[in-house]
Amino acid sequence: MNEYPKKRKRKTLHPSRYSDSSGISRIADGVSGIFSDHCYSVCSMRQPDLKYFDNKDDDSDPETANDLPKFADGTKARNRNQSYLVPSPVLRILDHTVFSTEKSTEVEICDEECASPESVHQHTQEESPIEVHTSEDVPIAVEVHAISEDYDIEAENNSSESLQDQADEEPPAKLCKILDKGQALNVTAQQKWPLLRANSSGLYKCELCEFNSKYFSDLKQHVILKHKRTDSNVCRVCKESFSTNMLLIEHAKLHEEDPYICKYCDYKTVIFENLSQHIADTHFSDHLYWCEQCDVQFSSSSELYLHFQEHSRDEQYLCQFCEHETGDPEDLHSHVVNEHARRLIELSDKCGSGGHGQCSLLSKITFDKCKNFFVCQVCGFRSRLHTNVNRHVAIEHTKIFPHVCDDCGKGFSSMLEYCKHLNSHLSEGIYLCQYCEYSTGQIDDLKIHLDFKHSADLPHKCSECLMRFGNERDLLGHLQVHETT
């Protein structure tokens, strides 16, 4: 902008409507009613009044005489019958220029400086009510906004030096001015919301996102709907938000419990379903080998094989044709092939299987050394127990063993053989474990069960019976029972 703009004249009948754009109102220049600086527009719907002062007793008061306006010819208005126009006193409040139009009360002003308009408003709220004195000379303030910078109207007889002096004498914009409730002191809506004018086009822009609008009401509604604060109901641990405080309290109780920890990484959660989902999403492709007895997953077959060795310590594999038992499933498979191959062929021929023979029957069951499973080749059924696969093949895929014992897993081709086998179990009786729900028809099976299942919890074993105890004192007390008998 040019430092010395071209000066133009403009006359008006209502000089009190105008003041400069810098926030400082000027006194009308004589009777012409032209202000000394930029034009202002009044935001009030009321037309500001102009005070008429009669020239009475002016000659006796030199201070008043100096304040009288001059006419165009340089003479002062001294005649009593003359009346002249002057604008009312001006107050500057929060960077707004206000014209006084009516009678009001006298207001006390403090000189405390504030860092921002928001702090000024807060300071005025915290101040105690001031003492008000009624006066007819102090009018009510009406808020006035400066108009656009497009107006470039200046009054004549104002040099650039005088403009610079007046700018230097401008009062600080951050002075706190405490006004009473009767005055029109309102914090603008822009000070209550994080809003800015984006550019010269006049769009209101939200500071929290990219939203902008031509109308302030739209932006205000956007802030309320999209950026409503919910910090009071947010969990500090997982940052989850809740609509009410009661829901937040119930959620916080979950974090006080022991979390579920992923065995493959450092993931922790208080919700078991979240842990299951985490394993399925993150570790499912990395852990393809699992144990069918305890559902533990492994990333390699060697780890799974070592895990199976722990299970095999407390289990015995029984032959379905004889009393042979072993702890090695591969040994049981070799035993059936080597010792009972002829019997399998005979049973297969009796059932009319024709040319299927030994190879056809044995090919239905294979042993997977990598995964340590017995696998049915017909449907893929697998188990670590050879007895289970034999039972499955006998029932589902052949007619060799239509009758299978539920206690030991042995199969029989006829009902007569099956009933004889059941009588053998009844004659021996059923042996029950007193420490768990295990039952068997053979005493040796019960002894093996006690040694492998309960030896860790009950290490002290009675040599006279099958009783086991957790400490030596209980065992010594039990041995006294045998001595008395």
Swiss-Prot record:
Disulfide bonding pattern of the chain: none
Gene3D superfamilies the UniProt entry points to: Classic Zinc Finger
Keyword Acetylation tagged: no
Stretches for region Disordered: 1-23, 54-80, 115-136
Predominant subcellular localization, coarse grouping: nucleus
Chain intervals for the UniProt region annotation (Interaction with CTNNA2): 371-455
Location of cross-link Glycyl lysine isopeptide (Lys-Gly) (interchain with G-Cter in SUMO2): 76, 177, 181, 226
A Pfam family hit: zf-C2H2
Zinc finger (C2H2-type): 204-227, 233-255, 260-283, 289-311, 374-397, 403-425, 431-454, 460-482
GO biological process, one term: positive regulation of cell growth
A Gene Ontology cellular-component term: nucleoplasm
Single GO MF descriptor: zinc ion binding
Protein family: Belongs to the krueppel C2H2-type zinc-finger protein family.
Function: Binds DNA and may function as a transcriptional repressor.
Xref: PANTHER family: ZINC FINGER PROTEIN
Subunit-level organization: Interacts with CTNNA2.
Protein name, as recorded: Zinc finger protein 639
Species of the source: Mus musculus
Gene that this sequence comes from: Znf639
